[in-house]
């Protein structure tokens, strides 16, 4: 299938520049899309727009909107996302409704032609809903993935049905999107954008050491834990169990990153703020390049972040995937799964940490390598006319 051609086989119309609006709500999401955004900016057929919302505007999480500018990208608009949305599902639903209304106006003001969203987060769902209703083309990255432990997984598939163009990471993800009834010509296998240029983007060890002077290379655990349940008390208990498991049987140093802003996150934050473990550092936010450097040089990554499933294999870093959040995802051989059980966590650590040194895994990454950003930009620059894209017919 030629990605530049629509269902009729007619070539895309090149007469105008398409405005592609990327809506981003988290530090991680923006970072993994950076090579794609640069490829869009470099295309003569496309004009990049960025709308920041969610955690980017939250000072408790580092006000990461500044990192967008530091990466050389301009923010064209912001959409408020109240901090209380992470405290309860009702507050999150109310915030989503308000965001849809504001996003509809923002997309109209910007004159956006294509709205680009990633994954399964509620901010992406709000953007896709607003764009679809307002007759904008929705382009969705990482559709067809499975993460059965997340409530957001249903949002991923809802976004797939709202989207007009799909950029999938693996052949299995492509098959799932097709089984949802999407036309094959709309579905493009490009690999995971987060893996694109990964090793080049990582900060060198000297920069990691400058930011965290006490760390020893391959002598620390990088901990990234996000909520699964909206109950903050339960998530605080789970975070404490994770810490209990990581305290013994492995490296004595830890870098603990704050969670995303999903309901229940406040419980994890409370646990990290009260952290008294010797050798442990809790950090609200680090830049993408520093995060990648930390991941590359860690003895292991522990928690339930998708970065452990998708990106860590490109560095050979071992991963302890804890709990159900990433259940169902395709994974590489560097990943060991366990529950929120200190005994299981210690057992997993012993498989990795041997004679005071961690194992490293040389494995091909199932999520691909370089080139995803370039491929996405090529597809976007050669899309068929809007009237073809916007007319969706369920294929099955």
Task: Report each predicted region and the residues it spans.
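A nucleotide-sugar donor-handling region in carbohydrate enzymes
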Residues: 23, 56-59, 162-237, 396
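Nucleotide-sugar donor-binding patch of glycosyltransferase catalytic domains
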Residues: 313-360
């Amino acid at each position: 299938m030629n990605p530049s051609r629509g269902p009729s086989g007619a070539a895309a119309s090149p007469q105008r520049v398409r405005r592609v609006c990327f809506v981003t709500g988290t530090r991680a999401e923006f970072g993994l899309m950076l090579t794609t955004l640069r490829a869009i900016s470099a295309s003569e057929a496309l004009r990049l727009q960025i709308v920041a919302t969610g955690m980017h505007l939250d000072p408790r999480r580092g006000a990461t909107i500044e990192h967008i500018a530091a990466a050389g990208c301009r923010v064209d608009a912001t959409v408020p996302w109240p901090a209380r949305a992470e405290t309860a599902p009702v507050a999150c639903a109310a915030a989503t409704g308000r965001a849809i209304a504001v996003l509809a106006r923002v997309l109209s003001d910007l004159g956006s032609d294509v709205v680009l969203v990633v994954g399964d987060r509620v901010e992406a769902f709000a953007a896709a809903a607003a764009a679809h209703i307002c007759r904008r083309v929705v382009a969705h990255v990482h559709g067809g993935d499975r993460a059965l432990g997340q409530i957001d997984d249903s949002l991923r598939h809802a976004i797939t049905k709202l989207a007009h163009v799909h950029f999938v990471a693996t052949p299995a993800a492509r098959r799932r999107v097709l089984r949802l009834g999407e036309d094959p010509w709309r579905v493009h296998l490009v690999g995971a954008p987060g893996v694109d240029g990964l090793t080049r983007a990582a900060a060198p060890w000297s920069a990691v050491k400058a930011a965290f002077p006490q760390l020893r290379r391959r002598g620390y655990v990088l901990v990234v834990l996000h909520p699964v349940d909206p109950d903050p008390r339960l998530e605080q208990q789970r975070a404490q169990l994770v810490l209990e498991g990581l305290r013994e049987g492995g490296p004595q140093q830890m870098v603990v990153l704050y969670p995303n802003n999903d309901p229940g996150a406040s419980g994890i934050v409370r646990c990290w703020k009260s952290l008294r473990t010797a050798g442990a550092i809790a950090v609200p936010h680090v830049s993408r390049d520093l995060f990648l450097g930390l991941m590359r040089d860690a003895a292991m990554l522990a928690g339930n972040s998708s970065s452990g499933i998708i990106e860590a294999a490109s560095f050979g870093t071992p991963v302890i995937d804890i709990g159900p959040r990433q259940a169902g995802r395709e994974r590489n051989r560097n990943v060991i799964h366990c529950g929120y059980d200190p005994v299981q966590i210690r057992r997993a650590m012993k498989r990795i940490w041997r004679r005071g040194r961690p194992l490293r895994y040389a494995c091909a990454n199932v999520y691909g390598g370089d080139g995803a950003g370039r491929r996405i930009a090529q597809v976007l620059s050669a899309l068929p006319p809007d009237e073809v894209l916007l007319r969706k017919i369920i294929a099955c």
